[in-house]
Amino acid sequence: MGTLDTKGFTEEQEALVVKSWNAMKKNSAELGLKLFLKIFEIAPSAQKLFSFLKDSKVPLEKNTKLKPHAMSVFLMTCESAVQLRKSGKVTVRESSLKKLGANHFKYGVVDEHFEVTKFALLETIKEAVPEMWSPAMKNAWGEAYDQLVNAIKSEMKPSS
C-alpha cells in the first residue's frame, strides 16, 4: 500500500534534492520551526489541528511541543524526498504511512492544508539555500512532496 510510482522523479531531481538536503540537514530543527511558523502565518486556523497548540498562551516559537514536532515533520519530509528514487517508493522512518494517514484523517486535514504546507516548505527551502535555489529545484522538491502527500492520502481513513 505504501508504494507509489516514482517514475515522475528523475535522477536530476534526486540530485537537486540530495544536494540541498545535505546543506540544510544540520539546521533541521530551526528550519522545521520556520516551516510551521510559515504555515500558521498563511493559515492561522491550522493551529487548531494541533492539540498541544489549542489552548496554549505561549508564543509559537517558544512552544516546547511544537519544536520537536516541527523538526520531525521537516526531517521526515526531506528524508522521504531523498530516498524517493533510490527506494522507488515513499519511505518514512519512525512512523508508518498507515499511522500518518490515520492521524491526518483523525485531525481533519484536507487538501488545502497540504497545499499550504507545500508552499511553506518550498519557501523555507528557498530561504535556507538561496544560492542553490532554481525553478528546477522547486520542481524537484514539489514532486517529492506531492508523492509523499499522495502516499499519506492513500492511507487517510479511520485507524482500525
UniProtKB/Swiss-Prot annotation:
Swiss-Prot/TrEMBL catalytic activity: Fe(III)-heme b-[protein] + nitric oxide + H2O = Fe(II)-heme b-[protein] + nitrite + 2 H(+)
Site (Homodimerization): K138
Disruption phenotype: Increased nitric oxide (NO) accumulation in roots during early symbiosis steps as well as in mature nodules. Reduced nodule number.
Record-annotated disulphide pairs: none
Gene of this entry: Glb1-1
Function as written in the Swiss-Prot or TrEMBL entry: Phytoglobin that reduces nitrite to nitric oxide (NO) under anoxic conditions (e.g. during flooding or in waterlogged soil) and upon root nodulation. Required for general plant development and during nodulation, especially for the onset of symbiosis. Monitors nitric oxide (NO) levels during early phase of the nitrogen-fixing symbiosis and buffers oxygen in functioning nodules. May not function as an oxygen storage or transport protein. Has an unusually high affinity for O(2) through a hexacoordinate heme iron because of a very low dissociation constant.
Self-association and partners: Homodimer.
Keywords: Heme, Iron, Metal-binding, Nodulation, Oxidoreductase, Oxygen transport, Transport
PROSITE patterns: GLOBIN
EC number: 1.7.2.-
The protein's required cofactors: heme b
Gene3D superfamilies: Globins
Domain annotation Globin: ranges: 8-157
Cofactor note: Binds 1 heme group per subunit.
Pfam family, one: Globin
Induction comment from the UniProt entry of this chain: Mainly expressed during symbiosis after root inoculation with Sinorhizobium meliloti, during nodulation. Up-regulated by nitric oxide (NO), particularly during nodulation mediated by Sinorhizobium meliloti inoculation.
Record: residues binding heme b: S51, K65, H69, K99, H104
Species this protein is from: Medicago truncatula (Barrel medic)
Motif extent (Homodimerization): 41-45, 111-123
InterPro entries: Globin, Globin-like_sf, Globin/Proto, Leghaemoglobin-like
Transmembrane region(s): none
The protein, known as: Anaerobic nitrite reductase Glb1-1
